[in-house]
Curated annotation (Swiss-Prot):
GO terms for cellular component: cytosol. Keywords: Acetylation, Cytoplasm, NADP, Oxidoreductase, RNA-binding. InterPro entries: ADH-like_C, ADH-like_N, GroES-like_sf, NAD(P)-bd_dom_sf, PKS_ER, Quin_OxRdtase/zeta-crystal_CS, Zinc-ADH_QOR/CCCR. This is Quinone oxidoreductase. Belongs to the zinc-containing alcohol dehydrogenase family. Quinone oxidoreductase subfamily. It is found in: Cytoplasm. Signal peptide: none annotated. Homotetramer.
Amino acid sequence: MATGQKLMRAIRVFEFGGPEVLKLQSDVVVPAPQSHQVLIKVHACGVNPVETYIRSGTYSRKPALPYTPGSDVAGIIESVGDGVSAFKKGDRVFCFSTVSGGYAEFALSADNTTYPLPETLDFRQGAALGIPYFTACRALFHSARARAGESVLVHGASGGVGLATCQIARAHGLKVLGTAGSEEGKKLVLQNGAHEVFNHKEANYIDKIKTSAGDKGVDVIIEMLANKNLSNDLKLLSCGGRVIVVGCRGSIEINPRDTMAKETSIIGVSLFSSTKEEFQQFAGILQAGIEKGWVKPVIGSEYPLEKAAQAHEDIIHSSGKMGKMILLL
């Protein structure tokens, strides 16, 4: 290590595996921004389920080892690289796709995936914007092509992506149904845009959804746990209805005939398949929502950086998650 290099704390992964492979190191060199990059002093970083899949080595996208996890950060610009004109040192920002990893005291981000963080939102809320809200936008408008007047069922609506989906869908004129695993979770979902919420732990909750949807069925289902719900989802859809798969933790057997009579679709979502133009569209939706006040990130569990392994354990195994999980730095 060269003399004079600035060091930081960061979580590093040297091998794929369980949460225990997340190692806190205090001698990681602070990266320098290259052309069209910014260096962010991280105040908060979001924790997303996909980061546990990547860490385990079971995800389609495998980073080169060692690496630092994390995509969503909010903080203050520390320095900027050549060609950056939109930001300067001291600016409050959030980003959804770090270059160097977000579980760290400093993170690099491309200037075109970095956005101003309004004073109306704190850093924790800023770290809850990126992946949840951009994923919700892609699921609703790119994958489902949802339209005002349609109905949408959001499974796992009390989590980060679920709440973002409810807020966005309600603001765009959809009838919003949600599921949650507790009375507290149901209340939170109602407060964030849903017209009606069902407890997915109740044995007859599917029947209650059918009653609410009526003979037509549900136009769009945003599915956070396809390996559990997909078969039932297909029975809830309207003619031409769409199941949008945002999350899945295993396999499931379905009957393809359930898609035929009503000509329904199952569509997967991959946020990072979005084009630059699509990301700009999603950012515009968020900006409008922030200005109008309906984008309201809800924060759930908070952990210090050194508890990242516990956060990964909890985000997968804790039932009835509410809000966005955050690492505080």
